Amino acid sequence: MLSFILSIFPIVLLIYLMVKRNALPSYVALPWVATLVMGVHLLHFNTDIVTISANVVSAIIAVQTPITVIFGAILFNRFSEISGATNIMRKWLGNINPNPVAQLMIIGWAFAFMIEGASGFGTPAAIAAPILVGLGFHPLKVAMLALIMNSVPVSFGAVGTPTWFGFGALKLSEDMILEIGSITAFIHSIAALIIPLLALRILVNWDDIRKNIVFIYISVLGCVVPYFLIAQVNYEFPSLVGGAIGLFISVWAANRNIGLAKVTNTLDNNAVSAGEVVKALFPTGLLIAFLIVTRIHQLPFKAMMNDATIWFSTTLGSLGLFEISKGLIFSLKNIFGSNVSSSYKLLYVPALIPFVITVLIAIPFFKISSSNVKQILVSSLQQSKNPFIALIGALVMVNLMLVGGEHSMVKIIGRTFAEISGSNWTIFSSFLGAIGSFFSGSNTVSNLTFGSVQLSTAETTGISVALVLALQSVGGAMGNMVCINNIVAVSSVLNISNQEGTIIKKTIIPMIIYGIIAALGALFLVPLFYNL
């Protein structure tokens, strides 16, 4: 029990430090909590200093993935502002329909749904949120909406990575993974009838939601129906294709004012020409095109960018073995002589491609001056500084909580919760997945971490394995709402300072409601449609 208390205490302390009255910013709280976890390892778990040091170095390498994505997104958004593309898009969207509910659903729901399907890595909020701020919505509230909306598609984000890769270590059959995907989509589809309304409520009142409810559900079902149907036969494309279909349906319905209350257009949006719109949409279109062609494994680019064949290798003394692969994967292996390794996929991580490359292509296209290019670069680097410190703290904490295999702090937390709940595990299963996402920043990592705990709990209690693993995946997705990495990412892209605790206090409520919906769906609705 002492091991459980010491394992969960850092998470409880982190939440307290970030939501108390005079909350600490994440770039202060996370390094302090990471230091505490280090102390627990040394004093209670008797972990050797080499293992701890190796995991700290590994975390510093691993942090390059989220921070370069954040930098790339900031760079792209700063470019969009300075080039005038954001302003043209704002006017164009205002002309499609000035109703704020329509704009929030098109960009915050359907567009983000599609981007999640292509990329994951927190990019939907990073791309969609600045567009909404450009339309005049409050940045802090937009951050909350973006986090809450980006939950339903997450289990099939980055072309299904949380499902097929997240559960890959469990060596499940193809049919079992497909069944897990099917049940996951079913539970998400139920939640999708309620969660977008809670997200909208942050920015508009219930009366406006009621007046526009027909359009809201056209947009929701436009994404969710194809998403659910595709998940019956495939676990890679539900979010990508569902989001694309839903985006088309949402824009079509908004253009015709279907299900929307008439509102006065308060935007300063003189009619923009088709040429201006095409030019303004060019960077975003290029961005999406890069994401899609580099994520679909039927095309050759994904394999090329993930090619692990060694191209260059050298020993860096006691630090470890440094390697560069043909796919430009930079790796440091056997750090300090341990079995700890870390890597950074320069081409595959959505940073250089698509964000930086898109900006480099678009700069001459928009004839941006050298002084403005310098301003874009300098402001992007400055905006990335605090998230970098916060994410080093987060990843050191995560790495150390995973040290010890079956006896790691994370596994102790998971097993203790499972033992306490016993046969009632269906009710709590999704919340374990959410805890995984909260501290790790990823549905995929949550599934990798807790998949084995969920599997053994299901087998011990006699609950359906497919159902429990589906709830794990749903939990990992809903945990995106409160996930530290995503909150840091969207805050930094929108240039919001020291509001992480405020965001968590708002987003944790819909996350808990999501978990309750998942539990009720698993107990009462899933058995009606699935032979468990």
Swiss-Prot record:
This is Putative L-lactate permease. Its main location: membrane. Keywords: Cell inner membrane, Cell membrane, Membrane, Transmembrane, Transmembrane helix, Transport. GO terms for cellular component: plasma membrane. The chain crosses the membrane at residues 23-43, 56-76, 101-121, 129-149, 152-172, 180-200, 213-233, 234-254, 274-294, 346-366, 387-407, 420-440, 462-482, 508-528. It comes from the Bacteria. May play a role in L-lactate transport. Signal peptide: none annotated. It is found in: Cell inner membrane. It is a multi-pass membrane protein. GO terms for molecular function: lactate transmembrane transporter activity; solute:proton symporter activity. It comes from Haemophilus influenzae (strain ATCC 51907 / DSM 11121 / KW20 / Rd). InterPro entries: Lactate_perm.
